Amino acid sequence: MDPLGSFMTQITRFVPIFAILFGLGTFGLNAAISQEGAAKGAGSIEDKSPFETLPGMQPSGNMLLPNGWTINAQGRQAPLGDFPVHLLVHPDGNNLIVLHCGYGEHEIITLDAKTLNKIARVPVPQSFYGLALSNDGAWIVASGGEDERVYAFPYNKGYLGEPVVHTLATKTDKFVVSGVGLSKDDTEFYACGLLGNQVKRGKRPFGAMEKPGVSPTETLQLPDDSYPYTVLEDAANQRLFVSLWGRSAIGVVDLKTFQLVATWKTQSHPTEMIYLDDTNRLLVACSDENSVVALDATTGELQEVLLTALYPAAKNGSTPSAICVSADRRVLVAVNSCNNNIALFDISEPKKSRSLGYIPVGWYPTNVKFTVSGDQIIVTNGKGLSSKDNRYGPNPLKPAPKNVTEYIGGLLQGSLSAIPTPTPEELATMTRLAFQGAPLRKDSVVVDAERSPNNPVPAKVGDPSPIKHCIYIIKENRTYDQLFGDVAKGNGDPGLCIFGENVTPNHHALVNQFVLLDNFYVDGEVSADGHEWTMAAYATDFVEKTWPLTYGKSRGKLTYPAEGATKIGQPSSGYLWGKCKEAGKSYFSFGEFIANGRNPGDPSRAKIEVLEGHFDPNYRSYDLDYSDLDRAASFIKRLKQFEEAGELPNFITMHLPNDHTAGTRVGKLTPTAMVAQNDAALGLVIEAITKSKFWPEVAVFVIQDD
């Protein structure tokens, strides 16, 4: 066999959602779990409509995720910890080293490369992506994240000793160590400051500090919003490459002066880099653009763009966030984090690279490396191999100590895939599996299976429809069973229903009169990625990599990354409002992606540019001390103004958040009271819409963010 030779448990439903098409009659608007992924073939759901298929283990042995993707990870699988983000292969070929930076324990895990058995687990107080090995393999250097540290661990056959600690900033500084690196002779170390927009260079990386305090370093200041991700040294030319995650560029640093001498344009969100000195190319993963770019390493000129998505015309969202090359530098591998596969390319001839195929791996792959011998491809999967329910979570009837597995942030533990480097024939088979496991369509047309003749939803863009206005209501955090487990016609669990019809009569009246979607799921785990998926059908790698820290081990430096809070968190493909603008449709937001004024009554402001002039400044966004009934009143007041003007925006978003509840906090409304309040507010909103002049041409969709 000549690898690549010829060409070189049950799922918890996260969301109660119903759709109402007002004035258009009642019909079954089914929620499709899968589209193309339901086609016949290996890794698919045979002979069943996707509308009838539940996520979880399928007869084929594959795992259907709630988002419609099928996990059919190739090779051997091994469990890891919480959100593995960076992988190294020890130069002796015997061990694998994995850094974890999730909601739970931050740690370095070492594994035997042959058996995949764990050798050691070493906790790190906090980290963020950065991991490097000394040239002799005797030291591991790791990021300390918001603790502003770089750790240097002595390493011996899979075991780590007590680290040498370099403190790079004070506790109040906002440097935040991300990527780290070592000089070729191991006498210096480099550290990126994600929030400080800086790179620091220090000496004696493995030597203990002579006195306590901040270590002496040289500091390079980068432009604002650079968000330096990692570094790569070109020792022969005395240069340091820095991937500027937030500026779509590579910074080139002169190591003699430690000054920025050039900035080379890339595509959006450059992350990992590989320098090929034999062909003078710099390869850069661009995670927000479905691409890996090849730059001339002398001039920075763009030589070619390698598209990693399954389909050439696919919209952004594949998330190629990490890359590696084979020892002979002929094959490039890129992880497609959001496609649950890796893409392989023949890069043997500059400017003439070509796709070789795809290999299915686990859920949200984050890093990839070839083994030293080249006989295996190793992949870390950030979210493991399946979705899970929190069966060990809180139960009001059975008090128990808090457990990290009770919360979604720590529920999806990572995994490792070890794939024998395939032959061309094996890769062709794996490529077919990758396509069969994807809920994508080559032409992106609407699935028209089981459509009734009077379906008002257009089969394709441009077809006529009586729907002229869509109102999209986003609520917070409730599961299907919590609200609708008591609905007999739905596939729910009454034992999990805590806000049933006695608490939510309006929700129940709506799903009984109109449409109940009991097999519909959201892609977000928490509000941070949830609102991004809700409004963009995508959460960037910046959001995915930072929210676990902000929700878990944050020291208060990294902040909420989503809903327009950061420019880098916004996908380059934009949000639904931007798509409306491109299509010449009017749009308006009540509270979604809106920043509140300091006090109720103070005007709010738009968080993103596209919403400027397209929102109600008197509608208060997320604030659990503010009543949803007041939000409903604010909407109704504006609706009357729309009626007086005779025009209703084509697309309206509304944040109705108080079903989030304040838990059992002292002095707050009880969860039951808050959900009941939210139910009453929704009823008032729907009543106002149905009594308005726009009613015959309106469709309303209600969804949970996560």
Predicted regions, residues:
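Bacterial N-terminal signal peptides that target proteins for export
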Residues: 2-18
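A short, polar/charged loop/turn motif at coil->beta-strand junctions and beta-hairpin connectors
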Residues: 3, 16, 70-74, 214, ...
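Intrinsic-disorder-associated interaction segments
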Residues: 4-7, 423, 628
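Bacterial N-terminal signal peptides
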Residues: 15-28
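Generic recognition of well-ordered alpha-helical segments
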Residues: 17, 378-380, 415-418, 506, ...
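Predominantly soluble domains enriched in secretory-pathway, periplasmic, or organellar proteins
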Residues: 33-454
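N-terminal pro-sequences and low-complexity stem/linker regions of secreted or lumenal proteins
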Residues: 429-706
